């Protein structure tokens, strides 16, 4: 075994060099590349080079929202924890997750729905532009779709990367059909770590 001796501060840079090498010269639009590479770096999964889908001018739209202090709402505390708080603070943004709140649990119980869907309803009442970052619950994306098509709430941006088997593929396709600016991982793959990685990639484009 030939170990690489890399200084701690150089590990991320070296990782991105390896990603670049293993993509064998594939070209990606300049705005998309940092997001794509950050997700691959987080997961070590090169499938994202093919299944990560961006709506037209998605990155520009997301960056503009972040520059203007949009609220990021996540569907898991894990995704919220993974978002870089220093970068958030530099831009005057905040990340929220309603999943563990008693109010969310009570609303879900009363309406016979999931806490993820109830979290979306709470996000709809924030009264400010929302970037919804979903890495776990397809029911959150489905509830977003219901709000969008009903015309009563539309998130400013959707990061749709839930992972799993039940309604995961379908929920992502629904979001992609709405016209709302989005970054979606088509298929079954995703996760809270992927949602956080996408948010961080966008934040770093503005703060590093």
What are these regions (language model features)?
Residues 79-82, 138-144, 165-169, 191-195:
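Short glycine/serine/threonine-rich phosphate/pyrophosphate-binding segments
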Residues 75, 159-160, 198:
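Buried hydrophobic positions in well-ordered alpha/beta secondary-structure cores of metabolic enzymes
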Residues 88-126:
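Long, charge-dense
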